[in-house]
Amino acid sequence: MAKASRLTRSTGQPTEVSEGQVTGTSEMPPTGEEPSGHAESKPPASDPMSTPGTGQEQLPLSGIRVIDVGNFLAGPYAASILGEFGAEVLKIEHPLGGDPMRRFGTATARHDATLAWLSEARNRKSVTIDLRQQEGVALFLKLVAKSDILIENFRPGTMEEWGLSWPVLQATNPGLIMLRVSGYGQTGPYRRRSGFAHIAHAFSGLSYLAGFPGETPVLPGTAPLGDYIASLFGAIGILIALRHKEQTGRGQLIDVGIYEAVFRILDEIAPAYGLFGKIREREGAGSFIAVPHGHFRSKDGKWVAIACTTDKMFERLAEAMERPELASPELYGDQRKRLAARDIVNQITIEWVGSLTRDEVMRRCLEKEVPVGPLNSIADMFNDEHFLARGNFACIEAEGIGEVVVPNVIPRLSETPGRVTNLGPPLGNATYEVLRELLDISAEEIKRLRSRKII
């Protein structure tokens, strides 16, 4: 485990608790009083682990208000990105259970927050409103009237069932920008099907390509990539729509299907099939356009990635192996010859890497400028000088837990760097603040709404 001095500002660590301690509810104050505030990041600017731009300078999206009414990641992650660059994000949750992501992932000492929630629900205020009740819908529309962006990811038709169709929302706020993320998009014959990242990976063709030839397709990693990718496209759409709104004063609707966001990044599989009828198949860790191009195990049981995509790169690898003859035109110096002798070239690489430790392989390849990298575990990353020098980790104080290390803000902007102001908030931590200060609702009325479980 990494030393705390390199990763945190104290020795405090999140408390391990059993899965049974994570529940679907959060205690709500018995009166109209606001719950305690959210945590702030406090590393000094010189700390390489700190978030860029931890001062109070105005960020580019300051003054933009975002309503995030989705669950999990597909869509809400776009709100996280906007929040990192100054937008105010109001997370609308059901009063009893909140976002189900609060209960997914590694448990913490807080019964309403897993580590996944803390990391990915960053830079938000939690506001509890029951959208299944008419008074809740009325409150929600008041928030919409005072906001710039709305993000939702329910199954198509759900918002309409609650009386929150796009025409209703647009009439409430003509300048509203609405991002709708769903498994299959808002139109088409499959629009009402449930959609999660795993299903989107399969439907889009990504899972078909993951694994080794002739074997069972595997998950492309353990992270819900589709949710993140769809959110990134959604965030791009929001920024484009904001620019359009600056020019015209009008908002617009943004529709992203998770599957199509994944499909969009699968390089040339569509034109290859459309023109030549070629179906891309699983390649394991390899590539159909280059060899050696894969993962190789070293003598000490560790792994490296080597990617020789050009003849020059292979020439450098041959020099690193101290076998320059391999790159001769008569052997494997030409890419077409290497591809034709794929198994032989891979076996040569396997044997060479297997005769050395990973550090030795890395040193020899780097000396010859061969594209090479270690297959890092998270423990490796916590101790890697480049991760630390780039400030890729942020140490944030989480209420009731202590310091938590999370991925830092991406992208890095020179003049207006983003920041992590707080981790996933306690359920309803800003309900009173938002209703009282933004909507000018009296404390007595807030108390009544709470007693009726509308908030």
UniProtKB/Swiss-Prot annotation:
List UniProt keywords, sorted A-Z: Carbon dioxide fixation, Transferase
The signal peptide stretch is none
A GO molecular function term, named singly, is: CoA-transferase activity
Q: Which reaction does it catalyse?
A: succinyl-CoA + (S)-malate = (S)-malyl-CoA + succinate; (3S)-citramalate + succinyl-CoA = (3S)-citramalyl-CoA + succinate
Positions of region (Disordered):
1-58
Pfam families documented for this protein: CoA_transf_3
Designated name of the protein: Succinyl-CoA--L-malate CoA-transferase alpha subunit
